[in-house]
Amino acid sequence: MAGAPLIRLEDICKTFHNGDLAVEVLHGITLDIRAGEFVAIMGASGSGKSTLMNILGCLDTPTGGRYLLDGEDVSTLNADELATLRRRTFGFVFQSYNLIPTSTAQENVEVPAIYAGTPAAERRKRAAALLNALKLGDRLDHRPSQLSGGQQQRVSIARALMNGGRIILADEPTGALDSQSGEDVMELLRSMHQQGHTVIVITHAREVAERADRLIEIRDGQILSDTTKRDIHTPEATLQPHEEIAGNGAHIADISEAVKMALRALRANIFRTVLTLLGIIIGVSSVVTMLAIGTGAQNTILDRINAMGTDLILVRPAMAGFRGSGSIATLVPQDADAILELPNVKSAVPEVTGTVTLRRGNVDYQSQANGTVPAFSLSEIVESRQRQLHHPERYRYLRPCGWLGTTVVKTLFPDGSNPVGDYILIQKIPFQIIGTLEPKGAGFGGSDQDDVVVVPLSTGNLRLFGQKYVRSITVQVKDSSLIDTTQNQIQSLLDQRHKKRDTMITNMSSVREDAAAMGKTMTVFLGSVAAISLLVGGIGVMNIMLVSVTERTREIGVRMATGARRRDILLQFIIEALSVSAIGGAIGVILGLGAAALASWAGLSVGYSFGPVLLAFACAFATGLIFGFLPARKASRLLPAVALSSE
């Protein structure tokens, strides 16, 4: 017969290795098959016929020899080039049908066209037409489990024809069918041969083999006989390789199609998917909640510091190596007067504090007494409600008067009466209440700023505490940008006055910076603790994906047989992992925000911001990518023949 053969095998050998043991399955097979032939390769189990079919269909590569397909040396092609060749040239019909159980009949038929880059509308139309031609038009949306064996095999045949199927390789196509269904399948194969397809049937049954025009018998890896029963009829219009629409083809047409396949696979085992999602959901929601609470705590601390004023400088007595600064009697009211003369100083307020016993009627109560001067209100620490009673004259002498914080008022005046003008005993000394203080709530560190009684500085020093020195001087500056310079000037002034360094000076701006840094550290710590659960969720994703790869090995083989390249398989399984992580991340963000809102309702300070939410979702997405890569890579590295033979 004129013309070069479509398939030429020259001295093909195949050896399998099991440790140190080498088993040669094919021994120097030489064979020509021309375009349009209907060939049956017959042999008993273990004869090597399935191995020969795998090599013919580019599902496996020979150990030795040369395989020419349409004049091209197949043995020189890499894995992706072999995938392209399978997609453009071959259509496979398997004994066990090898349909994807999670897909409908129409979706199964569309698989080869997906990897060929055929537009969705066109491939759906062609798949429906093929199934209608095979009398399955009313079964388009049925899954394999809803079809009979004969119907499943017809779906398999339609899939083989989806990309043209220039060469049809049928492996035991009637082996799992009843006699009538088997007869129908053989008639379909004969019809495909008459339409110009090259049909190669692999079988162990002589009655099936004799339906072909040419019968090649193989035994123990060698061709035993090669006979032609009748003149080979080659159709005038021999089919050409399938022309792919998407350039080089062999890629998933778009990401949306890969996502659809991923979601379809995830729905197949919904319980396992939910368990996998839980790990990501818990991890992401923990990160969002912890960061929100941490940010809220940081903001609360900073707000309290801001309320105290960031333009304040605090001067306290202290000496290097001396513990207990409160007992150092070096800071005096005259130091405040000297500080007030500095250029950037707005006010300098000396203060003396100590614990005192208050009494009204039969109620005794211990509180904090604060002796200060009129400028005290300028420090913005407390304010008097009765400013008309806030006269400097009351500070200059040992006047027994004072202002009460709201906690003290509630304790000594539980009946709600107005304390102004009334008298109480402080350290057994009668004091007139001339005002109350604005409520301040908890201070920095959790102390109650309302548990205080304010008295004139001179009264506090001599009548209550019996001392002339002060505990601290609070300085308010005019220009906050010069606060560091002013702090240095105060330090130099006091060093000069005291002839030594016996004071400790801090400004609220630096305290705020330290508190902000501490808050950030705590937030990072909380986020890190929560991120551990996200890491555990990621390991769960990897574990489930590895199980999925093992369970779906045959599906991977089917996809590779129909033209999927390694990158297509890699992309599909990575997208499955990313889909789990993205869904879990979205649910986790919602639950995390809900948990944060619940914490806020319960009284905790919560700080919402877009950054932590985006970070948590991005971490979930990255977790899916990182932990999904290893299973995806494992899937993409499988050999088609090995994957198809898995149980």
From Swiss-Prot:
Give the chief site where it resides.
membrane
Q: How does it assemble?
A: Homodimer.
Q: Does the keyword Transmembrane apply?
A: yes
What are its E.C. numbers? 7.6.2.-
Q: Which GO terms describe its biological process?
A: response to antibiotic
Q: What is this protein called?
A: Macrolide export ATP-binding/permease protein MacB
User: One Pfam family from the UniProt entry?
Assistant: ABC_tran
- Sorted alphabetically, which Gene3D superfamilies does this protein's record hold? P-loop containing nucleotide triphosphate hydrolases
Q: What does this protein do?
A: Non-canonical ABC transporter that contains transmembrane domains (TMD), which form a pore in the inner membrane, and an ATP-binding domain (NBD), which is responsible for energy generation. Confers resistance against macrolides.
User: What does the UniProt entry say about where the protein is found?
Assistant: Cell inner membrane
State any GO CC term. plasma membrane
Q: Which domain of life is it from?
A: Bacteria
Question: Its topology with respect to the membrane?
Answer: Multi-pass membrane protein
PROSITE patterns to which the protein is assigned, alphabetical: ABC_TRANSPORTER_1, ABC_TRANSPORTER_2, MACB
Q: Which organism is it from?
A: Brucella melitensis biotype 1 (strain ATCC 23456 / CCUG 17765 / NCTC 10094 / 16M)
* Molecular function terms, GO-annotated: ATP binding; ATP hydrolysis activity; transmembrane transporter activity
Residues reported to bind ATP: 43-50
- ABC transporter domain: which residues? 7-245
Please give the start and end residues of each transmembrane region.
274-294, 529-549, 573-593, 610-630
**What is the primary gene name for this protein?**
macB
Presence of the UniProt keyword DNA-binding in the record: no
By sequence similarity, the record places it as follows: Belongs to the ABC transporter superfamily. Macrolide exporter (TC 3.A.1.122) family.
* Keywords, sorted A to Z: Antibiotic resistance, ATP-binding, Cell inner membrane, Cell membrane, Membrane, Nucleotide-binding, Translocase, Transmembrane, Transmembrane helix, Transport
